[in-house]
């Protein structure tokens, strides 16, 4: 899980999901998991 100020899709399989106001990226590739933290 990468925590970044700005999250972006890395590949075509990446999806942007909002959970409890937190923007996350979920993907088949575990290295592409991201969470937005300011």
UniProtKB/Swiss-Prot annotation:
Keyword Membrane annotated: no
GO biological process, one term: translation
Disulfide bonds: none
GO cellular-component term (any): ribonucleoprotein complex
GO MF terms held by the record: structural constituent of ribosome
Keywords: Ribonucleoprotein, Ribosomal protein
InterPro entries in the record: Ribosomal_bL36, Ribosomal_bL36_sp
Residue ranges of the TM segments: none
Entry keyword Ribonucleoprotein: yes
UniProt-listed NCBIfam families: rpmJ_bact (TIGR01022)
Family per record: Belongs to the bacterial ribosomal protein bL36 family.
Protein name: Large ribosomal subunit protein bL36
């Amino acid at each position: 899980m990468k925590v970044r100020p700005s999250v972006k899709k890395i590949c075509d399989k990446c999806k942007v999901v909002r959970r409890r106001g937190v923007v996350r990226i979920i993907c088949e590739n575990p290295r592409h998991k991201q969470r937005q933290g300011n």
